[in-house]
Amino acid sequence: MRGNVYLLWGATTTGKTAFSVSVAKERGWSVIALDRFQGYHEISTGSGAPTNNELEKTERIYITPQRGLADGIITAKDYNYWLKSRVLSLPEGKSDFIIEGGSVSLLKEMVSDEFWADFLWEIKIFRAPSKDVFIKRAKRRITDMLHPEDGRPSIMDEVSSFFMNHKTIHPLEDIDGYRTIIDYCRCKKIGFDKLKIMTTDQEKIIISGIAEEYYAHALWQEQETPCFPHSWSRRW
């Protein structure tokens, strides 16, 4: 048995990150993000990566290759490979950790890999609340992405900067949140380098659109969550 893993699984806005910080502080464990996007600095705001203040001095590890987002998003297969390498490199006495996230593709890759059977698992699943509650929470979070108070660029700034630096918005259009912004700009013929001129009403439309996108994705995540294999020893 290699060590203990506490998996915190669920959709966005369900409280996983805050809970992971609480557990990390209590147990002294690191948190590994089960997310293919949060490790890219170009999209730290819109991907939902927690701020340093939110992490409260706990360690959060991102499994991201040493390349930029323009070179493509890490695949689930590659993520699993690098995650295993990272776990095997943990120092003796620090082999217990938390995995927190909601990526279906990553979890499916892990449950099909016998490597992960050699751990003692504790699993907590965060269910999406009612649609009204979810949308309210999501809108609050998206508003913070549009107007961050921690010095980070807004999600709009991230779209503009990526477009101006690379003359493309791929692969942003494949990511929740960014997809809604890009589709809206195309529909309204707004240049990706002109997002600072968005009106309050336009922002409200985008916020509502992203919230609905998040909710639809949350329902899909719950439907597509793979079964945990019997080979995973677990404590519930």
UniProtKB/Swiss-Prot annotation:
Pfam families, alphabetized: IPT
UniProt keyword Transferase present: yes
Annotated keywords: Cytokinin biosynthesis, Transferase
Assigned EC number: 2.5.1.27
Matches recorded under InterPro entries: P-loop_NTPase, Tzs
Keyword Transferase among record annotations: yes
A single MF term (Gene Ontology): AMP dimethylallyltransferase activity
Catalytic activity as recorded in UniProt: dimethylallyl diphosphate + AMP = N(6)-(dimethylallyl)adenosine 5'-phosphate + diphosphate
Family under the similarity heading: Belongs to the isopentenyl transferase family.
Protein known as: Adenylate dimethylallyltransferase
Taxonomic source organism: Pantoea agglomerans pv. gypsophilae (Erwinia herbicola)
Gene assigned in the entry: ipt
